[in-house]
């Protein structure tokens, strides 16, 4: 599989474990948190399969973001299963989004003044340093919002948590991405247009 094809399907592969989780969550009957424990087992297995496949397809490497997802899924999924308590798996998504927000916020300090978003999108868009910094803060805000939403659904609106985790955050992300690329279309590098 060539790199362009792999880059195109990566976002879809990322959702497979969540879809497996949601399916098992909705189709398993049980008392208390039994359905969440079963869904967490499915999530762990699907995560290891999907990211194992990505590891092979990406020439035996994973991106930092992918490692973060795998490690946090294994840690929080493992704690959920070990203690038979869904509290731990509900922590995963808010923590992942908070780490992304924090990482982008701190990126100029560790990348010689270059915002992390510029490192990721620089090959596609041409902007001034000030514009890159603003865009970086927009993404920090987005990941902060996602962390807050995930925490609210995980601990306040618990009955909707699985639905939001599987589909709601995907909808928020797609709307954000469409808005971003609509705004950024004027900054696309001329050699890409």
Swiss-Prot record:
Keywords: Cell inner membrane, Cell membrane, Membrane, Transmembrane, Transmembrane helix. The chain crosses the membrane at residues 5-25, 36-56, 67-87, 93-113, 138-158, 164-184. It is a multi-pass membrane protein. InterPro entries: YciB (IPR006008). One of its GO terms (cellular component) is plasma membrane. The keyword Coiled coil does not apply. It is found in: Cell inner membrane. Its main location: membrane. Pfam families: IspA. Plays a role in cell envelope biogenesis, maintenance of cell envelope integrity and membrane homeostasis. Belongs to the YciB family. HAMAP family: YciB. This is Inner membrane-spanning protein YciB. It comes from Vitreoscilla sp. (strain C1).
């Amino acid at each position: 599989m060539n790199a362009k094809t792999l880059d195109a399907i990566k976002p879809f592969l990322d959702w497979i474990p969540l879809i497996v989780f949601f399916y098992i969550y909705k189709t398993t009957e049980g008392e208390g948190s039994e359905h969440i424990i079963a869904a967490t087992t499915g999530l762990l297995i699907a995560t290891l399969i999907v990211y194992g496949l990505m590891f092979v397809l990406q020439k035996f490497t994973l991106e930092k973001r992918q490692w973060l997802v795998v490690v946090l899924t294994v840690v929080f999924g493992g704690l959920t299963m070990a203690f038979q308590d869904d509290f731990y798996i509900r922590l995963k998504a808010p923590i992942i989004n908070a780490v992304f927000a924090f990482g982008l916020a701190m990126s100029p300090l560790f990348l010689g003044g270059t915002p992390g978003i510029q490192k990721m999108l620089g090959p596609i868009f041409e902007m001034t340093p000030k514009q890159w910094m603003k865009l970086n803060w927009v993404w920090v805000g987005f990941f902060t919002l996602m962390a807050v939403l995930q925490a609210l659904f995980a601990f306040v609106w618990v009955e909707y948590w699985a639905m939001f985790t599987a589909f709601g955050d995907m909808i928020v992300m797609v709307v954000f991405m469409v808005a971003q690329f609509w705004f950024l279309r004027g900054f696309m590098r001329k050699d890409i247009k």
